[in-house]
């Protein structure tokens, strides 16, 4: 069994911290929260410290932040119904664009693999796709309304322009652009959770997705493409996503976030029971019937709800978490 070793505990935000995001280089991260501020942290020697505080972009809580794949831009989603785009053009971070259109709180933001598309979602039940049109110019490419409730999370596929969204309506939906008419369509609806789906993340090649829910389970979904060897039917030549594994019994409350490490294959969860848990695929796991085991759990990782977890994209086994308790923690998993 593995261990979760606490390396750093960081404070600075006032109130609850909603989100953390690693820079693509892994030596910088951003955090956001109830205090309407974004903090940029960097590592000097063995010490993490706040290098920049961005406090003039939003009027309400900042729910989520994400770096662009190139690392030049930072997007922040806020309860003030806007998404801000920040860049460090003149040595200092500044807000270059504010994306407006959602009617209510923006809950999540995600950059596509190329950095050419941005997705946002909101309590207004919609998912928006924005095209990066040039220097600080963003154009709305699609407004998608297949969800019947608040949309909690959007995440782009790691290798294709395919978007996944998770909602209070208990479903996950997939979106792709029609090659003929260039319209964005919902291509799949994933149903198995019995309550709100809070978080989703793809594995390294995007052939599987992990989801976490208010129903206290995590689920593994697998993509079956037209002509698949398993004989899974694919109506209208669309990829079908099937739930191939449900992991239950480890979490006692809602699971608010899940992160699938692209380097190690480990899965981390952030839970409303103040815990962080790490799961690993078993050695005898089958492709169409995978099995996962919990390798370690930090039951009291934080003093209150854990809101977000994210694996470092460069440093294998390093995990960051944040919580309602106002702290950020950096952990190392030893298997």
From Swiss-Prot:
One Pfam family recorded for the sequence: WD40
PROSITE patterns tied to this protein: WD_REPEATS_1 (PS00678), WD_REPEATS_2 (PS50082), WD_REPEATS_REGION (PS50294)
Tagged with keyword Repeat: yes
Disulfide bonds: none
GO CC annotation terms, alphabetical: cytosolic [4Fe-4S] assembly targeting complex; metallochaperone complex
CDD domains, alphabetized: WD40
GO BP annotation list: iron-sulfur cluster assembly; protein maturation
Record's keyword annotation contains Signal: no
Start-end of each WD repeat: 12-51, 57-96, 101-140, 146-185, 192-231, 250-289, 301-335
Gene3D superfamilies in UniProt: YVTN repeat-like/Quinoprotein amine dehydrogenase
Keywords: Repeat, WD repeat
PANTHER family assigned to the protein according to its UniProt record, in alphabetical order: CYTOSOLIC IRON-SULFUR PROTEIN ASSEMBLY PROTEIN CIAO1-RELATED (PTHR19920:SF0), WD40 PROTEIN CIAO1 (PTHR19920)
Role according to the record: Essential component of the cytosolic iron-sulfur (Fe/S) protein assembly machinery. Required for the maturation of extramitochondrial Fe/S proteins.
Family according to the record: Belongs to the WD repeat CIA1 family.
Full protein name: Probable cytosolic iron-sulfur protein assembly protein Ciao1
Organism per entry: Drosophila simulans (Fruit fly)
């Amino acid at each position: 069994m593995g261990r979760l070793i606490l390396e750093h505990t960081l404070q600075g935000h006032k109130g609850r911290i909603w989100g953390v995001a690693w820079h693509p280089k892994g030596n910088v991260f951003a955090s956001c929260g109830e205090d309407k501020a974004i903090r940029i942290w960097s590592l000097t020697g063995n010490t993490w410290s706040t290098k920049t505080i961005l406090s003039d972009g939003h009027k309400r809580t900042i729910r989520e932040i994400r770096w662009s794949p190139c690392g030049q831009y930072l997007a922040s989603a806020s309860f003030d119904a806007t998404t801000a785009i920040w860049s460090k053009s003149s040595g200092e971070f500044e807000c270059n664009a504010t994306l407006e259109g959602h009617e209510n709180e923006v809950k999540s933001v995600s950059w596509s693999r190329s950095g050419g598309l941005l997705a946002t979602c909101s309590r207004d039940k919609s998912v928006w796709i924005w095209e990066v049109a040039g220097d600080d110019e963003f154009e709305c490419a699609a407004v998608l309304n297949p969800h019947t409730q608040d949309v909690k999370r959007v995440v782009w596929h790691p290798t294709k322009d395919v978007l996944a969204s998770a909602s209070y309506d208990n479903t996950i939906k997939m979106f792709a652009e029609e090659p003929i008419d260039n319209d964005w369509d919902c291509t799949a609806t994933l149903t198995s959770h019995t309550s709100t789906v809070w978080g989703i993340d793809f594995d390294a090649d995007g052939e599987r997705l992990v989801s976490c829910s208010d129903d206290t389970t995590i689920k593994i979904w697998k993509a079956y493409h037209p002509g698949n060897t398993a004989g899974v039917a694919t109506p209208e030549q669309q990829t079908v996503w099937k739930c191939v594994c449900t992991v239950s019994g480890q979490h006692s409350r809602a699971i608010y976030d899940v992160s699938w490490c692209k380097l190690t294959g480990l899965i981390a969860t952030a839970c409303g029971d103040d815990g962080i848990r790490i799961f690993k695929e078993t050695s005898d796991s089958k492709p169409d019937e995978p099995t996962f085991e919990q390798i370690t759990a930090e039951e009291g990782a934080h003093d209150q709800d854990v809101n977000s977890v994210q694996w470092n994209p460069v440093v294998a086994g390093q995990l960051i978490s944040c919580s309602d308790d106002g702290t950020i923690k950096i952990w190392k998993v030893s298997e």
